[in-house]
Amino acid sequence: MATGTDQVVGLGLVALSLIIFTYYTAWVILLPFIDSQHVIHKYFLPRAYAIAIPLAAGHLLLLFVGIFITYVMLKNQNDTKKTQ
Amino acid sequence: MTKLAQWLWALALLGSTWAALTMGALGLELPSSCREVLWPLPAYLLVSAGCYALGTVGYRVATFHDCEDAARELQSQIQEARADLTRRGLRF
């Protein structure tokens, strides 16, 4: 069965994704229709960041995946050399 | 048509619609707030897909369960196979 930690981590991931989705939807979809003098604009970064942040996050993710794959492959190569 | 082709067609259709609307190729005069929503739309779709993926993984982590019946069935099948193989002269 899923233990307590699993449930906490899983529900935390669900909550995180819901928070990100709600905030991003409000930022990108709803904000242009709200008057630009409204107080709510204080709680959001300028609009260019709505693209820049996901782009940077995606690049970081790809970078880390690449580093991980390189590390694992190099390690495997060394291991097979040792056994031969 | 394969699933891949379907997805590619849908993406191409959506992408060309988006490009046409953003570049103003159709000659439509959209209100400025609509245009503000339109240009980050691909990023928005990507982020939504990412959120959905993260949520699915989280939900499955929170609710996964052991398949006890299947484990019992598998154990009994292993026993059966061992007995059968021992009868035919295989030693473990």
From Swiss-Prot, chain A:
Keyword tags: Endoplasmic reticulum, Membrane, Transmembrane, Transmembrane helix
Quaternary state and interactors: Component of the dolichol-phosphate mannose (DPM) synthase complex composed of DPM1, DPM2 and DPM3; in the complex interacts directly with DPM3. Component of the glycosylphosphatidylinositol-N-acetylglucosaminyltransferase (GPI-GnT) complex composed at least by PIGA, PIGC, PIGH, PIGP, PIGQ, PIGY and DPM2. Interacts with PIGA, PIGC and PIGQ.
Protein family per UniProt: Belongs to the DPM2 family.
Domain of life of the native organism: Eukaryota
GO MF: enzyme regulator activity
Transmembrane spans: 11-31, 49-69
PANTHER family registered for this protein in UniProt: DOLICHOL PHOSPHATE-MANNOSE BIOSYNTHESIS REGULATORY PROTEIN (PTHR15039:SF11)
Compartments where found: Endoplasmic reticulum membrane
Functional summary from the UniProt entry: Regulates the biosynthesis of dolichol phosphate-mannose. Regulatory subunit of the dolichol-phosphate mannose (DPM) synthase complex; essential for the ER localization and stable expression of DPM1. Part of the glycosylphosphatidylinositol-N-acetylglucosaminyltransferase (GPI-GnT) complex that catalyzes the transfer of N-acetylglucosamine from UDP-N-acetylglucosamine to phosphatidylinositol and participates in the first step of GPI biosynthesis. May act by regulating the GPI-GNT complex.
GO biological process: dolichol phosphate mannose biosynthetic process; GPI anchor biosynthetic process; protein glycosylation
Topology class, membrane: Multi-pass membrane protein
GO cellular component: dolichol-phosphate-mannose synthase complex; glycosylphosphatidylinositol-N-acetylglucosaminyltransferase (GPI-GnT) complex
Naturally occurring in which organism (per UniProt): Bos taurus
Entry protein name: Dolichol phosphate-mannose biosynthesis regulatory protein
Pfam family, one: DPM2
Pathway: Protein modification; protein glycosylation
Record-linked InterPro entries: DPM2
Curated annotation (Swiss-Prot), chain B:
Record keyword Lyase present: no
Keywords: Endoplasmic reticulum, Membrane, Transmembrane, Transmembrane helix
Membrane-related topology note: Multi-pass membrane protein
One Pfam family of this chain: DPM3
InterPro entries named among the record's database cross-references: DPM3 (IPR013174)
Molecular function terms, GO-annotated: enzyme activator activity
Domain of life: Eukaryota
Its biological purpose: Stabilizer subunit of the dolichol-phosphate mannose (DPM) synthase complex; tethers catalytic subunit DPM1 to the endoplasmic reticulum.
Family affiliation: Belongs to the DPM3 family.
Subunit structure: Component of the dolichol-phosphate mannose (DPM) synthase complex composed of DPM1, DPM2 and DPM3; within the complex, associates with DPM1 via its C-terminal domain and with DPM2 via its N-terminal portion. This interaction stabilizes DPM1 protein.
Matching PANTHER family: DOLICHOL-PHOSPHATE MANNOSYLTRANSFERASE SUBUNIT 3
Protein name: Dolichol-phosphate mannosyltransferase subunit 3
Taxonomic lineage: Eukaryota, Metazoa, Chordata, Craniata, Vertebrata
